[in-house]
Amino acid sequence: MSFRDDVLAGLAVRPRAIPARWFYDRQGSELFEAITRLPEYYPTCTEAAILEKACAELADEVGRGLAVVEFGSGSSTKTRVLIRCVEPATYLPIDISGDFLREAAAEVASEFSGVQVIPFEADFMRPLALPKAVAGSRKFGFFPGSTIGNLEPAGAVDLLRAMRGSLGEGARLLIGMDRVKDQDVLLAAYDDAEGVTAAFNLNLLARINRELEGDVPLDAFRHRAVWNEGASRIEMHLEAARDVAFTAAGERFAMAAGETVHTENSHKYTPEAARLLLRAGGWEPVREWIDERGWFSVILAEARPPAAAP
């Protein structure tokens, strides 16, 4: 579905919800990069430190000269660590935000002149065929940031299976998965003191105004982050601070004070839940690295034979 279709459908249902992938226009991508630098947002710095520490072991496991395929590349900061470790022949970053993707890819190409960089603008949340330029290469998927946690369990399994199909037989996947931890730590990471995450969430409404001829009053909404214990996830919502009516894509909507639009989930995993999810998605975990606090996992998995994948 298009941005327009998802917005109209999401605002019409109860409870209201808009898929998180629409956060990432240029402004949203830049705001998310700012989030990754916040002191409260532990996943980025923790995962980067794990990768630095695991570098030699990772290179021994996967070898060199392969094609690194990164799903949702963003600014490719952690990719630089990975490229230094495994020295790939090709780097294929995939991202939905085209301008942001091309700028980030150009920076990587400038820094690593011996690596062929092929930016690929696509929504990796859907099945896709990789460019022919990497058809004959050994493929190493990279899916950092615990982005897998943004999906419902069934959707996460579908995505992992799609990745396995895209990467092919003999592929490896390096995936970051955030662990269950203290609720206060989790809530601070998704509701920072500076309000950057709030701006990121509210940018979704600003995007509706920019792209769908909307007139959503941004000051009528506030960012809300909650921990859903039963579902083991952080939820982000846009909550109406007062009764409000607005237009989006030619349709009129009204929301009562306290009503929310659910914009994102971020599931957190126990070690066993992470392994079960990967296996259900057609991947067999072969190695795991964690930080000293046990907050975050980086897992190396290999494609399971088709008969072994559920």
What do these predicted regions represent?
Residues 75-87:
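Conserved SAM-binding loop of SAM-dependent methyltransferases across substrates and taxa
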Residues 185-267, 271, 275-283:
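Substrate-binding/catalytic lobe of Class I Rossmann-like enzymes that use SAM or dcSAM, i.e.
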Residues 15-62:
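Class I SAM-dependent methyltransferase Rossmann-like catalytic core
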Residues 90-95:
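Conserved SAM-binding motif I beta-strand of class I
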